[in-house]
A protein has these predicted regions:
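Bacterial N-terminal signal peptides that target proteins for export
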Residues: 1-13
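Bacterial N-terminal signal peptides
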Residues: 12-23
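Active-site beta->alpha N-cap acidic-glycine motif
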Residues: 27-131, 139-157, 231
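C-terminal domain-boundary segment and adjacent tail
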Residues: 28-31, 62, 228-268
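Active-site-proximal beta-strand/loop segments in catalytic clefts of secreted hydrolases
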Residues: 40-43, 65-69, 99-103, 161-164, ...
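Histidine/acidic-residue-rich catalytic or RNA/ligand-binding cores of hydrolases
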Residues: 108-115, 193-198, 228-234, 262-266
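His/Asp/Glu-enriched short active-site or ligand-binding loop at hydrolase and phosphoryl-transfer sites
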Residues: 165-211, 248-259
Length: 268
């Protein structure tokens, strides 16, 4: 038990103790009123650095879904030139899933059990191909292999279909090789790929702040070729600040109740 001397010195000590205790209490973080799960898909990569810097400034963790996409630099997002970027995000504690290596869009399930797919990049870009479940797994695992080669880290057993286009057979194929599919909440659609002429950044920000709730998964991109007024420079920082003011915290999908057990089981 702490004791204080008598007289004026005692009063001074008590005052000092009160000030210190008050400062400690003020410095203690407020309890989270809910958690938002930020996710980013690869894209043109035009906003990749800005997004990483903004997350770092807010001490916010996110989950990134990776495909080998053409970037504004003329390279591809899983080329060795992007290794420092991905390594830095790994070191900061973010999570990572596969978005198919060639950014492959699902078309439809076929009667023979195969899935009709259409790669955006790679040797079969623009062509419709019929894949078996194993070929789907191979495509998902290409990202895991490249990610490990670039960073030395292991990809999380999560994936997201490009465009969110998912068929029953495609979902089953991903699950068969250990990947859980991740979509996003209705309010979590950032709108960063919508035309800025009709969907202004101010409108998208207001919509997100009004609609997001505890447990929601947010989906945005590291850059969109078609949007004239980029989303991230105008929206991301005020979005995170606004959510923080509402008492929300941010976490990766490793902590999401729908995925944490799956991830733990796949890690065993």
């Amino acid at each position: 038990m702490m004791t204080f001397p008598a007289g004026p010195m005692r009063l001074a000590c008590l005052l000092l103790a009160w000030i210190v205790a008050g400062n400690v209490a003020a410095a203690a973080p407020a309890a989270c009123k809910g958690t938002i799960y930020l996710t980013f898909d690869t894209g043109s990569q035009s906003q990749a650095t800005l997004i990483a810097d903004t997350l770092r400034r807010h001490h916010a963790k996110a989950t990134f879904f990776l495909a080998n996409e053409k970037t504004v630099n003329g390279d591809f997002s899983l080329d060795p030139s992007w290794a420092p970027y991905w390594k830095a995000l790994v070191a900061e504690g973010h999570a990572f899933g596969t978005h198919t290596f060639d950014h492959v869009y699902a078309q439809r399930d076929l009667p023979d059990g195969k899935i009709e797919m259409k790669p955006q990049f790679g040797a079969q870009a623009g062509k419709k191909v019929a894949w078996t479940g194993q070929q789907v797994c191979d495509e998902l695992n290409r990202v895991a292999t490249r990610f490990h080669a670039l960073t030395g880290a292991t990809l999380d057993p999560l994936w997201r279909a490009p465009g969110g286009k998912l068929t029953p057979q495609l979902r089953a194929a991903g699950a068969a090789c250990g990947y859980a599919h991740v979509g996003w909440a209705p309010a979590g659609f950032s709108g960063d790929e919508l035309p800025s002429q009709t969907w202004s950044n101010a409108k998208l920000l207001q919509q997100s702040l009004a609609g997001l709730k505890d447990g929601d998964i947010v989906m945005a991109h590291l850059g969109i070729w078609s949007r004239k007024d980029p989303w991230a420079p105008a929206v991301l920082d005020p979005l995170l600040s606004g959510l923080e003011q509402k008492g929300f915290c941010f976490a990766t999908l490793r902590d999401h109740p729908d995925y944490r057990q799956h991830i733990a089981e796949q890690r065993r």
